[in-house]
Protein backbone atom coordinates (compact mmCIF):
# COMPACT_ATOMS: atom_id res chain seq x y z
CA UNK A 1 0.00 0.00 0.00
CA UNK A 2 2.92 2.35 0.79
CA UNK A 3 4.32 1.97 -2.74
CA UNK A 4 0.97 2.66 -4.38
CA UNK A 5 0.40 5.73 -2.19
CA UNK A 6 3.85 7.24 -2.81
CA UNK A 7 3.92 6.41 -6.53
CA UNK A 8 0.60 8.19 -7.07
CA UNK A 9 0.61 10.91 -4.38
CA UNK A 10 4.02 12.46 -5.12
CA UNK A 11 3.45 13.03 -8.87
CA UNK A 12 -0.04 14.43 -8.32
CA UNK A 13 1.19 16.87 -5.68
CA UNK A 14 4.16 17.92 -7.82
CA UNK A 15 2.00 18.41 -10.92
CA UNK A 16 -0.31 20.68 -8.92
CA UNK A 17 2.08 22.56 -6.63
CA UNK A 18 5.14 23.31 -8.78
CA UNK A 19 3.30 25.10 -11.63
CA UNK A 20 1.23 27.08 -9.12
CA UNK A 21 4.37 28.13 -7.24
CA UNK A 22 6.10 29.21 -10.46
CA UNK A 23 3.06 31.17 -11.66
CA UNK A 24 2.71 32.83 -8.26
CA UNK A 25 6.37 33.86 -8.49
CA UNK A 26 5.62 35.52 -11.83
CA UNK A 27 6.89 32.87 -14.24
CA UNK A 28 3.90 32.68 -16.60
CA UNK A 29 6.02 30.98 -19.28
CA UNK A 30 6.05 27.77 -17.24
CA UNK A 31 2.94 26.55 -19.08
CA UNK A 32 4.99 26.28 -22.27
CA UNK A 33 7.31 23.77 -20.59
CA UNK A 34 4.79 21.95 -18.38
CA UNK A 35 4.77 18.77 -20.43
CA UNK A 36 8.34 18.18 -19.13
CA UNK A 37 6.92 18.21 -15.60
CA UNK A 38 4.20 15.77 -16.62
CA UNK A 39 6.80 13.51 -18.26
CA UNK A 40 8.84 13.63 -15.04
CA UNK A 41 5.78 12.71 -12.97
CA UNK A 42 4.93 9.78 -15.25
CA UNK A 43 8.55 8.60 -15.09
CA UNK A 44 8.40 8.76 -11.27
CA UNK A 45 5.20 6.71 -11.20
CA UNK A 46 6.49 4.09 -13.65
CA UNK A 47 9.79 3.72 -11.77
CA UNK A 48 8.06 2.17 -8.77
CA UNK A 49 6.91 -0.78 -10.84
CA UNK A 50 10.13 -1.58 -12.72
CA UNK A 51 12.20 -4.59 -11.60
CA UNK A 52 15.53 -3.89 -9.93
CA UNK A 53 18.64 -6.06 -10.03
CA UNK A 54 20.03 -8.02 -7.14
CA UNK A 55 23.20 -6.36 -5.90
CA UNK A 56 25.55 -8.50 -3.83
CA UNK A 57 22.72 -11.01 -3.50
CA UNK A 58 20.29 -8.48 -2.01
CA UNK A 59 17.08 -7.10 -3.42
CA UNK A 60 17.48 -3.39 -4.15
CA UNK A 61 15.50 -0.48 -5.48
CA UNK A 62 18.31 0.49 -7.86
CA UNK A 63 16.09 0.90 -10.92
CA UNK A 64 13.53 2.88 -8.96
CA UNK A 65 16.21 5.33 -7.86
CA UNK A 66 17.90 5.42 -11.28
CA UNK A 67 14.66 6.21 -13.14
CA UNK A 68 12.43 7.74 -10.46
CA UNK A 69 15.24 9.53 -8.68
CA UNK A 70 17.90 10.55 -11.16
CA UNK A 71 16.10 10.68 -14.50
CA UNK A 72 12.97 12.14 -12.89
CA UNK A 73 15.10 14.88 -11.32
CA UNK A 74 16.69 15.61 -14.68
CA UNK A 75 13.29 16.22 -16.28
CA UNK A 76 12.06 18.23 -13.28
CA UNK A 77 15.24 20.34 -13.38
CA UNK A 78 14.81 20.99 -17.09
CA UNK A 79 11.20 22.07 -16.56
CA UNK A 80 12.15 24.48 -13.77
CA UNK A 81 15.21 25.74 -15.66
CA UNK A 82 13.18 26.51 -18.78
CA UNK A 83 10.31 28.01 -16.80
CA UNK A 84 12.70 30.38 -15.06
CA UNK A 85 14.47 31.19 -18.32
CA UNK A 86 17.76 30.32 -16.64
CA UNK A 87 20.88 29.61 -18.66
CA UNK A 88 24.41 29.14 -17.49
CA UNK A 89 27.64 27.44 -18.37
CA UNK A 90 27.59 23.65 -18.30
CA UNK A 91 29.57 23.24 -15.03
CA UNK A 92 27.10 25.47 -13.19
CA UNK A 93 24.13 23.68 -14.73
CA UNK A 94 25.59 20.29 -13.86
CA UNK A 95 26.31 21.42 -10.30
CA UNK A 96 22.74 22.71 -9.91
CA UNK A 97 21.39 19.42 -11.20
CA UNK A 98 23.49 17.38 -8.77
CA UNK A 99 22.50 19.71 -5.93
CA UNK A 100 18.84 19.11 -6.76
CA UNK A 101 19.17 15.32 -7.02
CA UNK A 102 21.13 15.28 -3.76
CA UNK A 103 18.52 17.35 -1.94
CA UNK A 104 15.64 15.23 -3.24
CA UNK A 105 17.58 12.03 -2.48
CA UNK A 106 18.17 13.19 1.08
CA UNK A 107 14.47 13.95 1.54
CA UNK A 108 13.64 10.52 0.11
CA UNK A 109 15.98 8.72 2.50
CA UNK A 110 14.50 10.63 5.45
CA UNK A 111 10.98 9.65 4.34
CA UNK A 112 12.09 6.01 4.01
CA UNK A 113 13.59 6.13 7.52
CA UNK A 114 10.41 7.69 8.90
CA UNK A 115 8.21 5.09 7.17
CA UNK A 116 10.30 2.24 8.58
CA UNK A 117 10.40 3.66 12.11
CA UNK A 118 6.64 4.37 12.03
CA UNK A 119 5.97 0.78 10.93
CA UNK A 120 4.38 1.90 7.65
CA UNK A 121 6.91 0.09 5.49
CA UNK A 122 9.44 -2.70 5.81
CA UNK A 123 12.32 -1.33 3.76
CA UNK A 124 15.91 -2.22 4.34
CA UNK A 125 17.92 0.88 5.06
CA UNK A 126 21.20 -0.80 4.12
CA UNK A 127 21.05 0.14 0.44
CA UNK A 128 21.38 3.92 0.85
CA UNK A 129 24.77 3.99 -0.87
CA UNK A 130 23.33 2.12 -3.86
CA UNK A 131 20.42 4.56 -3.89
CA UNK A 132 22.85 7.49 -4.05
CA UNK A 133 24.76 5.84 -6.89
CA UNK A 134 21.55 5.09 -8.81
CA UNK A 135 20.28 8.66 -8.36
CA UNK A 136 23.63 10.07 -9.51
CA UNK A 137 23.86 7.80 -12.56
CA UNK A 138 20.25 8.53 -13.50
CA UNK A 139 20.77 12.27 -13.32
CA UNK A 140 24.00 11.96 -15.29
CA UNK A 141 22.12 10.10 -18.05
CA UNK A 142 19.46 12.83 -17.98
CA UNK A 143 22.12 15.54 -18.27
CA UNK A 144 23.80 13.81 -21.21
CA UNK A 145 20.35 13.61 -22.81
CA UNK A 146 19.95 17.33 -22.17
CA UNK A 147 23.31 18.04 -23.78
CA UNK A 148 22.39 15.97 -26.83
CA UNK A 149 18.72 16.93 -27.21
CA UNK A 150 17.88 19.74 -24.81
CA UNK A 151 20.33 22.25 -26.20
CA UNK A 152 18.86 21.63 -29.65
CA UNK A 153 15.39 22.33 -28.22
CA UNK A 154 16.70 25.45 -26.42
CA UNK A 155 18.32 27.03 -29.45
CA UNK A 156 16.78 30.29 -30.62
CA UNK A 157 14.35 29.99 -33.52
CA UNK A 158 14.62 32.21 -36.59
Cite the ranges covered by each PLM segment.
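Bulky hydrophobic segments
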Residues: 1-126, 137-158
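Divalent-cation-assisted or electrostatically stabilized phosphate/pyrophosphate-binding catalytic cores
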Residues: 131
Amino acid sequence: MYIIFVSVFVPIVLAAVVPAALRRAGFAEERRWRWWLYAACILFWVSWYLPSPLIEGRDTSFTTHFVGGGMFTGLLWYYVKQSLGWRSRWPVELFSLFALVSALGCVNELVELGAVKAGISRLTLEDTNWDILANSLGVLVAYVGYLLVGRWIDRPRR
